[in-house]
């Protein structure tokens, strides 16, 4: 639905469906959807149409975002947002900010989530969030064990 706002409808296609990608602490099912951007749409238009990513918010996205606002006690901050750049040639290289540690005033914050669907098991979803946050938590643990040079 997001790409149909900024792409030629007949060009929008699933080019990869539920491929398994393995990472150090988790596995992901990955699907790719591509389309030819409309001539009157810029890179920023594509960004605005596709973020926040439905994979993190749920669907239908407008209602899912309302529910998130109603239920979650605090803002997600950068989690689920975007890290990257836009250049003057109209290119962009962006990544969704997940499984990251955000540090402010010496305090690190790690957020992780799981996809809740009809047959979700709460214990399994909780275990998934622990697995997803493990790398960032380990990095914080290592950083806290380091001593400044000369100490």
Residue spans for each PLM region:
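Conserved hydrophobic core element of enzyme catalytic domains
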Residues: 9, 22-151
